[in-house]
């Protein structure tokens, strides 16, 4: 999920922190719709347009999970769709 606000179609205003927050809001909505929660997430992949944004993204990321963190990969990419700063994908599994 990119940090795009579905009500406006625009990126969350600010920087990577705001886009990361919006990305998690989007993921929570999708997971909830499917009957999952963030506690069901077993793997994440974080794509960053600039690896210097890792610490800011990670602060938000850490606040989204309770207990053990899911497995994670974080990679720098040349560009993201619509010139986003961060994109996060998750895999969730019901136990």
Listing of model-derived features with the role each one plays in the protein:
Residues 1-95:
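Short, polar/acidic, helix-capping and beta-turn segments at strand->helix junctions
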């Amino acid at each position: 999920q990119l940090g795009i606000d579905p009500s406006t179609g625009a990126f969350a205003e600010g920087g990577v922190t705001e886009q990361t927050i919006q990305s998690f809001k989007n993921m929570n909505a999708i997971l909830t719709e499917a009957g999952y929660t963030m506690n069901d997430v077993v793997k994440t992949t974080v794509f960053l347009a600039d690896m210097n944004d890792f610490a800011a993204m990670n602060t938000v990321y850490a606040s989204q999970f309770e207990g053990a963190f899911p497995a994670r990969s974080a990679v720098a990419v040349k560009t993201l769709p619509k010139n986003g700063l961060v994109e996060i994908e998750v895999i969730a599994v019901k136990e």
